[in-house]
Amino acid sequence: MDATTRVELGENSYDIAIAKESLQQIGTFLRPLDLGQKVLIVSNPEIYGHYGETVVNSLQAAGFSVDTHLIPAGEQYKNLASIEKIYDTAFKNRLERSSTLLALGGGVIGDMTGFAAATWLRGINFVQVPTTLLAMVDASVGGKTGVNHPQGKNLIGAFYQPKFVLIDPTVLKTLPVREFRAGMAEVIKYGVIWDADLFTKLEAAEQIDSYATIDPDLLDLILERSCRAKAEVVSQDERESGLRAILNYGHTLGHAVESLTHYETFVHGEGVAIGMALAGAIATRMNLWTTAETQRQDALIKKAGLPTECPNNLAIEAILETLQSDKKVKSGKVRFVLPTKIGEVLITDQVSADLITDVLAPALC
């Protein structure tokens, strides 16, 4: 399947191209985009080992001058120290304002590369080439860039849109099963917040927990529909002043769980899965949706091989304190995205600490 989705943001508009075996032609895709002569690829050693040579050869064949900067894999490297090392390489290779940073990797690589691009020389070109399912359907689209702070996830960052996103679904064949499942958390999220038909199709599928077992046509549909959903939301609200906040479904408590486990116990999608299960339980307690809908959501999360329960070694007080550092806090109140039915959510700051405690207590006792 080849498909192109346009993110409409005026002068910052760009295309998301989904095309199998497209890494071999990446130079052809990028050459018409006025991205300057120099390209600095930012990746991690494992991903670069799989696809670096292919990307470099295609870019060089298209006339680009290419250099590389590698960052160790893992959320623990998503920090300002890693950004400074990207700056050092950019300086060493004399990147100019017309030059391009190219993110070849998952969400961590994309977030850091985008932030470096936003801040080096006050902004240079940025291209996303996501290699994980999570990055393909979520992190590579929308222009959120940044790094973590010891006090919370993604507290340092900027909105900075890429010039282009290239998705080659065939690279998922080398993705570890755990990472594929993590990406499915974001896909399920789109089903809950935006696309009830996608949710139903995931329910009806025989298997959705690995690249090897998922129906290829369903995977094509997942990529196209997820990118379209995010593009539609971002086009209406680039800087999260309203509608875009719904994309944070599952992320409020999910980020807290990730942070309190020092980004070592769960990958991001697993945190989101736990956060969605907890948000669903809160919505049920508030009579926003039914117990049956919560059960449908949690069953789909489990079908994807993802966790639904908060680890029992966390203190409720620590979770509540961490929530106060969430980026969505407004006037001192934590804002939650909560489902009202499959395919629709609302944003509310009327979730009390007592209610959160009641929902968390059974899991933490």
UniProtKB/Swiss-Prot annotation:
Belongs to the sugar phosphate cyclases superfamily. Dehydroquinate synthase family. The gene is aroB. One of its GO terms (cellular component) is cytoplasm. Zn(2+) binds at E186, H251, H268. Its main location: cytoplasm. It comes from Picosynechococcus sp. (strain ATCC 27264 / PCC 7002 / PR-6) (Agmenellum quadruplicatum). Binds 1 divalent metal cation per subunit. Can use either Co(2+) or Zn(2+). One of its GO terms (biological process) is amino acid biosynthetic process. Pathway: Metabolic intermediate biosynthesis; chorismate biosynthesis; chorismate from D-erythrose 4-phosphate and phosphoenolpyruvate: step 2/7. Its EC number is 4.2.3.4. This is 3-dehydroquinate synthase. InterPro entries: Dehydroquinate_synthase (IPR050071), DHQ_synth_AroB (IPR016037), DHQ_synth_fam (IPR030963), DHQS/DOIS_N (IPR030960), DHQS_C (IPR056179). Keywords: Amino-acid biosynthesis, Aromatic amino acid biosynthesis, Cobalt, Cytoplasm, Lyase, Metal-binding, NAD, Nucleotide-binding, Zinc. One of its GO terms (molecular function) is metal ion binding. Its cofactor is Co(2+); Zn(2+); NAD(+).
